[in-house]
C-alpha cells in the first residue's frame, strides 16, 4: 500500500491464472489464502471490538493484522471515537479499556480524594499499576504468617504522575492503593495478566 501511495506500485500481467511480469495490473506482493468464512468471522470480530474491547491477533505478518488495518481504513471521519462503560460508585470509577485473550486487559481506575481501593489478593492474577495523575500510596503484604506467627511486613510505594513508576501486584500479596490528595482525583492505568472473569474472579478480601 505504501509503495502504491508513493507511485512505486508493483505491476504484473497474467497468462491464465499464472502471474507474470507486466504492466497491466497492480498487485500486492504478499498474499494470504483464507476461506470466505474465515474472513467474515474476522470482520465480525473487528466490528464488535468496540463493544467487546477485544484486540485481534496482531502478530507480525499475520492475516488478521493486515485485515484489521484495512478494516479500520474504512471508518468515515466522525466515527473514530467510541464510548466506554465505566463502573462508577462513590469511590470513583473503574473502566475496562482493552482486552486480549493471551495478554490480559488494560483498565483505567479513578479514585476520589482520600479513597483506598483494593485490600484483596489473587491466586494467579498479577497486575501492574501506573499512576498517571495524582499521588498514591500503594501497599503490598504477603498473605499468611512468618515462622514466628507474625504477619509479613508491608511494602509501601509512594508514586505519582509526575514521576511515573510501575508497581507490580504479585500473586499471594494483598494490596491496596490510596489517593493521598485531599482535592484531586487519582488516575491509574491498571494492566492485569488475564481478562476479568465474573465466574472466576480470583479475588480474596484481606486488609493490607
Question: Model segments located where?
Answer:
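A short glycine-rich, His/Asp/Glu-containing loop-to-beta-strand
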Residues: 80-119, 125
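Active-site lining segments that contact anionic ligands and/or coordinate catalytic metals
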Residues: 103, 116, 125-126, 135, ...
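Short histidine-centered beta-strand/loop micro-motifs
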Residues: 95-97, 117-123, 130, 149, ...
Amino acid at each position: 500500500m505504501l509503495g502504491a501511495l508513493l507511485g512505486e506500485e508493483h505491476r504484473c500481467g497474467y497468462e491464465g491464472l499464472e502471474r507474470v511480469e507486466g504492466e497491466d495490473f497492480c498487485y500486492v506482493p504478499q498474499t494470504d489464502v483464507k476461506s470466505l468464512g474465515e474472513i467474515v468471522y474476522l470482520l465480525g470480530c473487528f466490528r464488535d471490538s468496540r463493544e467487546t474491547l477485544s484486540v485481534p491477533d496482531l502478530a507480525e505478518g499475520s492475516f488478521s493484522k493486515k485485515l484489521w488495518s484495512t478494516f479500520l481504513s474504512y471508518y468515515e471521519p466522525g466515527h473514530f471515537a467510541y464510548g466506554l462503560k465505566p463502573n462508577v460508585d462513590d469511590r470513583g470509577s473503574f473502566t475496562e479499556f482493552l482486552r486480549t485473550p493471551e495478554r490480559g486487559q488494560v483498565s483505567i481506575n479513578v479514585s476520589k480524594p482520600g479513597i483506598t481501593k483494593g485490600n484483596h489478593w489473587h491466586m494467579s492474577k498479577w497486575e501492574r499499576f501506573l499512576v498517571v495523575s495524582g499521588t498514591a500510596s500503594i501497599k503490598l503484604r504477603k498473605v499468611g504468617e512468618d515462622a514466628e506467627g507474625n504477619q509479613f511486613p508491608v511494602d509501601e510505594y509512594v508514586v505519582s504522575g509526575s514521576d511515573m513508576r510501575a508497581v507490580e501486584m504479585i500473586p499471594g500479596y494483598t494490596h491496596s492503593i490510596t489517593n493521598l490528595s485531599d482535592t484531586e482525583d487519582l488516575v491509574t492505568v491498571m494492566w492485569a495478566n488475564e481478562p476479568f472473569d465474573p465466574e472466576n474472579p480470583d479475588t480474596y478480601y484481606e486488609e493490607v
